[in-house]
Amino acid sequence: MESNNVVLLDFSGSSFGMRLRIALALKGIKYEAKEENLSDKSPLLLEMNPVHKKIPILIHNGKPICESLNILEYIDEVWHEKCPLLPSDPYQRSQARFWANYIDNKIYSTGRRVWSGKGEDQEEAKKEFIEIFKTLEGELGNKTYFGGDNLGFVDVALVPFTSWFYSYETCANFSIEAECRKLVVWQNCMENERVSKSLPHPHKIYDFVLELKHKLGLA
Amino acid sequence: MESNNVVLLDFSGSSFGMRLRIALALKGIKYEAKEENLSDKSPLLLEMNPVHKKIPILIHNGKPICESLNILEYIDEVWHEKCPLLPSDPYQRSQARFWANYIDNKIYSTGRRVWSGKGEDQEEAKKEFIEIFKTLEGELGNKTYFGGDNLGFVDVALVPFTSWFYSYETCANFSIEAECRKLVVWQNCMENERVSKSLPHPHKIYDFVLELKHKLGLA
């Protein structure tokens, strides 16, 4: 039987790392988590991702895979039997990849402007942020999950950002919940045990955001 | 037998569109190409890609797929038999996706600063541009193609940008060839008939760049 040595180089506040903690938990894969200090990255991190020098990195039997959506596809391909994330139909797969990329291209950068911005730029970012989630609600439609009746690739790509909602809302004084009712229903559905356990408490993220704002001279 | 109605909404100067013209040609898929006017986008384009409103878009039996790497994977999955682009091994697949994403995240934006920039920013962009291709040469190593003995996903993702080399070099007065010898050898290998036919003449791209610079008030 093939041995599976799985190591995840990660940082607990990273939404990108959370995706992989969720996927590994859903699929019941045992792994060793190594928390990185992003201000003083380990030699292992720099060796395993010399191009981007970023977490998360999955090391499977000594070989590194980088970039969270790429790792998510890898995990889904290698351990496909339990809780498949991407559908088997090529068109449905293309749609899932499209929306996961949409999340990657929009939420992190706009979210950063929401928690770190000031004045007009922050107000603009809040509007854009709500628009992004309205667009995602449009894609969700009347389904329970983005994946349909079962959670899938897009759900796992998106749900980590909900652990940041409290920080976005507190830093920028607005309510995502009040604007995006459908998203809240979806979020409640996502709170099955294995997903919740892989997400940090929103207050822990907020502490991290305050620390970061302090470091950046924004607080 | 399943009917295949394939339409490509495209713009001839787009490196992202070229990827798909190459893939469709390599796989021998007949399709209708519809050239878009990017200053006056068609109602079909806006209907088929309401989120990003961008070419290229592949419409397969009436259903749209957007984002060039996503479309490339879709084409490879639906028409897998002839000239497979992604390898079958999950680790090799993850590496191909990693490098294709690297190309997407780096070349277009840095290339734009090379052809449109001025002074110090342009000099900086030229340096970064060469560094990007040096990194890609490192990945190519001693292989004929990024895909190994046969051209693959990364080769198709990258080769369209070579049709822009003349424009980059002429606008910014430098030589990519002089700095990146390995890349030139690779580029020559790529010039098999079906790839060449899918790429516009470098002078046509240069005319387009001059027109664009004029429109943007840079010429």
UniProtKB/Swiss-Prot annotation, chains A, B:
Name the Enzyme Commission number(s) assigned to this protein.
Answer: 2.5.1.18
BP-aspect Gene Ontology terms: auxin-activated signaling pathway; glutathione metabolic process
Any one Pfam family here would be: GST_N
Q: What induces it?
A: By auxin and cytokinin.
Which stretches make up the GST C-terminal domain? Answer: 89-208
UniProt KW keywords: Auxin signaling pathway, Transferase
Ligand binding (glutathione): S14, K41, I55, E67, S68
Domain named GST N-terminal is located at 4-83
Q: Could you tell me which CDD domains the record lists for this protein?
A: GST_C_Tau, GST_N_Tau
Q: Name one GO cellular component term.
A: cytoplasm
Which InterPro entries does the record cross-reference, listed alphabetically?
Glutathione-S-Trfase_C-like, Glutathione-S-Trfase_C_sf, Glutathione_S-Trfase_N, GST_C, GST_C_Tau, Omega/Tau-like, Thioredoxin-like_sf
Enzymatic reactions: RX + glutathione = an S-substituted glutathione + a halide anion + H(+)
Instruction: Say which domain of life the source belongs to.
Output: Eukaryota
Extract the GO molecular function terms from the UniProt entry.
glutathione transferase activity
User: Looking at the keywords, is Transferase present?
Assistant: yes
Concerning its family, UniProt says:
Belongs to the GST superfamily. HSP26 family.
What the protein does comes down to: May play an important role in hormonal and growth regulatory responses.
- Name of the featured protein: Probable glutathione S-transferase MSR-1
What taxonomic classification does the UniProt entry list for its organism? Eukaryota, Viridiplantae, Streptophyta, Embryophyta, Tracheophyta
Gene name, Swiss-Prot/TrEMBL: MSR-1
